[in-house]
Every structure is written in C-alpha cells, then in structure tokens.
Design a protein with these regions (language model features):
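Short beta-strand/turn micro-motifs at beta-sheet edges
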Residues: 2-5, 66-68
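Basic amphipathic alpha-helical segments that dock to polyanions
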Residues: 49-56
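Beta-hairpin "wing" of winged helix-turn-helix
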Residues: 57-75, 80
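Accessory beta->alpha helical hairpin/"wing" motif in late/C-terminal subdomains of nucleic-acid enzymes
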Residues: 81-85
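Short, contiguous hydrophobic alpha-helices characteristic of membrane insertion segments
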Residues: 4-6, 60, 111-112
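N-terminal helix-turn-helix DNA-binding core of bacterial DNA-binding proteins
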Residues: 5-48
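Amphipathic alpha-helical dimerization/coiled-coil segments
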Residues: 86-112
C-alpha cells in the first residue's frame, strides 16, 4: 500500500461520519459527494466504503434504513449518524487537529 493510500485509509471513517453529520445518504451518494468535495482526491470504490459503513453500524456510530421504491427504482439503503457517531466524530476531529499540528511542527523543525 502506498504512502498516500495509507494516509487516506486513516481518515476515511472520519470523512464518512462528517458526510453523515450533514445529512442521511446512501452509499453511491457518499462516493460521489466525497469525490466532488475533494476535487477527485478521495475516489472510493464500493469495496472500500461498505466495510466502513458496516463497521460504523456494528459500533452504533451509524444506522441504516431502506427508502421506499420510487418510479420503478429499487429502494436505497440510507445511512445516518447516531448520537454515539457524533461523539465519535468529535473525538476524531479533535485528535486529527492535534495530529496535524504535531506533524506540521516536526516537519517544520519546531518540535521539541
């Protein structure tokens, strides 16, 4: 796995929770939203996203429900963040901010 892939993998759960904190979404919608918002930097495949979503559900950070079929379209599975998921997201964002700060300090030679 490349350095870039390792970095991306480390933040995907946080990014998915951030999307769900804004609104309930189905999988393909998350993939497209993340791709557009990151200007094609985060391009996920379903095989990457769905294990994250399943893990979020298993840990009660997200829950899912099926939409009603519309105009002959198949129902979609929507995911939404839970209260526990919002707490997890806040925790991750706080640690991400500290992590980013410390890495930046070290790279600039300002570390102790």
């Amino acid at each position: 796995m490349s350095f870039e892939q390792q970095l991306k993998k480390g933040v995907l759960e946080m990014l998915v929770l951030e999307l769900l904190a804004k609104k309930s979404m189905y999988g393909y919608e998350m993939i497209q939203t993340l791709k557009a918002a990151s200007e094609d930097f985060f391009v996920l495949k379903e095989g990457t996203l769905y294990p994250i979503l399943y893990r979020l559900e298993d840990n009660d950070f997200a829950k899912s429900s099926w939409s009603e079929p519309k105009d002959g379209q198949a129902p979609k599975k929507y995911y939404e963040i839970t209260k526990k998921g919002r707490e997890r997201l806040l925790f991750q964002k706080e640690h991400w901010t500290l992590f980013e700060k410390k890495v930046d300090e070290l790279l600039r030679g300002n570390g102790k």
